[in-house]
Amino acid sequence: MIRFEIHGDNLTITDAIRNYIEDKIGKLERYFNDVPNAVAHVKVKTYQNSTTKIEVTIPLKNVTLRAEERHDDLYAGIDLVTSKLERQVRKYKTRVNRKHKTHGEPEAFVAEVQEAPPENVDDVNAEPTNDSEIEIIRSKQFSLKPMDSEEAVLQMELLGHDFYIFTDRETDGTSIVYKRKDGKYGLIETTE
């Protein structure tokens, strides 16, 4: 059973909001043979311009489901986040079940589901629902240059990319800088 930890930032989580979140995201349970004992971490944040950001993270045994959406309407945002999570589960289900079939093992992770009609959500930014094999269409090899994170951001901007991989001059480890949806930058550092 999926349990919920719902936190509001600049917003009081009412019973109506809590019930809506639990009802919508709880429908993901239908994709599992054995419903995982998982905790869905839900963060709802309201900004001054009345935009709402909904973040959902569900750590499972073999995969972490995560989706985020900003929307003017809280309930529409919850619907969009649920759709994204559902697509992630379907893609993962397809990969895992295909892998188990080729190795002659029983389908361990996700049950086949009666396809429910998609809920009426206008998601203009929807990802394609292609559940076919993952196809790598381009491969590159290059040497990582030692630099600091500021220089890596400049290189990323010069190349017009959304991320840049480099060797951190201070730690000598591999790091990644990336551009976030809010226009700011993030840094991922690897550990030994």
Curated annotation (Swiss-Prot):
Pfam families: Ribosom_S30AE_C (PF16321), Ribosomal_S30AE (PF02482). InterPro entries: HPF/YfiA_ribosome-assoc, HPF_long/plastid, RHF-like, RHF/RaiA, Ribosom_S30AE_C, Ribosom_S30AE_C_sf. Residues 95-129 are annotated as: Disordered. It comes from the Bacteria. SUPFAM superfamilies: Ribosome binding protein Y (YfiA homologue). One of its GO terms (cellular component) is cytosolic small ribosomal subunit. The keyword Cytoplasm applies. Belongs to the HPF/YfiA ribosome-associated protein family. Long HPF subfamily. PANTHER family: 30S RIBOSOMAL PROTEIN (PTHR33231:SF1). One of its GO terms (biological process) is negative regulation of translational elongation. Its main location: cytoplasm. This is Ribosome hibernation promotion factor. Interacts with 100S ribosomes. It comes from Staphylococcus haemolyticus (strain JCSC1435). The keyword S-adenosyl-L-methionine does not apply. One of its GO terms (molecular function) is ribosomal small subunit binding. Residues 120-129 have a biased composition (Acidic residues). NCBIfam families: yfiA. Keywords: Cytoplasm, Translation regulation. It is found in: Cytoplasm. Required for dimerization of active 70S ribosomes into 100S ribosomes in stationary phase; 100S ribosomes are translationally inactive and sometimes present during exponential growth. CDD domains: RaiA (cd00552).
